[in-house]
């Protein structure tokens, strides 16, 4: 069921209740070849609700798990990113894994890899040196990659999941990680419907911009001028204008089509900006009405969380 949140996103607290760490926390160790996508994987896991810690010293992991389980809200899903650049990384994750399992935690290891050609291309694009390049025999990028492959061979062999990102787009990697670590359900698609005034500029983060300046402006009606589109007297006026309902439902259909495509591409956030001249009357009324329509939509294409915000309301 779609949830509608107006002006601010409601906080969602995980179920309360005491229990063992095993019941409360699961851990995934994210590692693999440099350039294979660890950073991207960490961002995806964060979007999926995991708390991500980068190169945490092994002696602090157990303490962090305990503190996270006792936090409010508790940290129930912890992703530990570990790579060869860390002075704590030995190439053998058995000590770390044993620590976590001794606490009764479900612990998995994710290993990311890619072909040499792709890794070389990615490093060239980013204009970075490989972290083990200076340790290789001839100091070349390809030699650094070879050293890392040897060093991480045991880690790869012990991993619960190995993902080769050679042919994967970011969105394809997102889907694979969602299948493995999403908890059995797709991550929520969060939609923001934002009203604004064109005279203050179009929102830079807008994925879709709707222009409602074709509707009659309540500003020129003295008894409506001081009211906003959040008030019934203005919203009823705006929504009853010729073409308003057709436009509203057409936009709803367009947003549904777009959110469906966003889901397929692994995207999780979308902002629809609704603009009028000053961001007080027409855009506010249409944004509220569009948010209600999307919020009442139970189809598979609809967003899961809808937030309605008014950027320029009160700015005049």
UniProtKB/Swiss-Prot annotation:
InterPro entries (UniProt xref): P-loop_NTPase (IPR027417), RapZ-like (IPR005337), RapZ-like_N (IPR053930), RapZ_C (IPR053931)
Domain of life per record: Bacteria
One MF term in the entry's GO annotations: GTP binding
Residues bound to GTP: 83-86
SUPFAM superfamilies associated with the record: P-loop containing nucleoside triphosphate hydrolases (SSF52540)
Keyword terms: ATP-binding, GTP-binding, Nucleotide-binding
Binding site for ATP: 32-39
Purpose of the protein: Displays ATPase and GTPase activities.
Family (UniProt): Belongs to the RapZ-like family.
Name by which UniProt lists this protein: Nucleotide-binding protein NFA_35930
The species this protein was found in: Nocardia farcinica (strain IFM 10152)
